[in-house]
UniProtKB/Swiss-Prot annotation:
Single annotated GO MF: heme binding
The keyword Oxidoreductase is annotated on this UniProt entry: yes
Family of this protein: Belongs to the peroxidase family.
Record's catalysed reaction(s): 2 a phenolic donor + H2O2 = 2 a phenolic radical donor + 2 H2O
Protein name: Peroxidase A
SS bond list: none
Keyword Methyltransferase: no
Signal peptide limits: none
EC class of the enzyme, as a word: oxidoreductase
GO BP: hydrogen peroxide catabolic process; response to oxidative stress
Subcellular location: Secreted
PTM field: Partially N-glycosylated.
Keywords recorded for this protein, A-Z: Glycoprotein, Hydrogen peroxide, Oxidoreductase, Peroxidase, Secreted
Amino acid sequence: VNQIGSVTESIEAVKAALVSHGAGVAVVGRKINLAGGPSYTVELGRFDGLVSRALYGLSKLPELGTHGLTLICISWALRVMSNVHDFFVHVAAKVESIHQYIESMRYGSLSPTIFDNYSKDCMIAHGAAHFLKXRPPDPAETRGGAVADNGSGAVARMPTLEEYGTNLTKLAEEGKANFDAAMVKLKNFSFILMFGVLGTIISFCLISSGAVLLLKHHVFPDSNINPSSGAAITSGVRGDLRAYVVAYLDPSRTSFTVDNAIYGEIRRTVLAWLIDSGTLQLSEKVLALVLTMVAATVLGVAKSMIKMGQIEVLTGTQGEIRAAEIVVEQLHAESGKPVLVALTGSIDKMTKDNVLNKTCK
């Protein structure tokens, strides 16, 4: 616990500066949007509510006893890693795109699609993969890491935590190179703002190459949930306690990117630890909270269940998901399995709220 605390504390010490610089780049993106281009925003701390607060609440339950503090430390580690990803993908990777968009405006050839293409190429180049769209894979195909459908129907292994750290380091180096090139063309922007972004990129190099791998050794020695732990999780759920989860997918990106794989692996580690330590053995109340109240953890459980062929997968556009509750009930009745609903396309708030209320029981 002390080692985890020292690692996360050192990263948290510089996070405030990263947030400030990231917000500055988001402002640049909004200004470009006003000129007619696509909008790019940065979701800062998007897992704060889903992970940190939820795990903090769980840590206060008497059933957890002295293990509560460990959960708090793990939640902080998740939050730090979440922010590292946010700044990499939503800030650093956009600098070159902003430069390209400005160039297209300067020479009179407006091409907003350049953003989408760059975004997709960036994701694909660094290990992005599509989520399962059809059958649950054979367990023999999934040993050694999470799996994904790459769009061709073939099942591919998702990156491990160590591989993810390596990818982040590579992305940091390429992101800095892109930034250096863009700096020459972006001299009309505030030098102070650009200096701040440069500091952010450099910080990424340090964080991705050091902190992510340190967290691996100190927090997550084995990120794969074993079949016995998975069976314990699912067998302890009441028949009317449905482990549904709704995932909203950005249509301009691949369905589930590398970060989802790593967070899913970490969540499975947390659950496996809870099961193996005996914490959840006799506590249906805590098990119900983990499976139904903590959205991020439910997503990890769902992926584990898919690996073991214990969950159905449903995808659809906004028009199709208005009947999602009926479809989910039908699949659940036919298969007797929980259902993961993965929604694609743009989702309006009303539809999102309705589906969440109906399917996330």
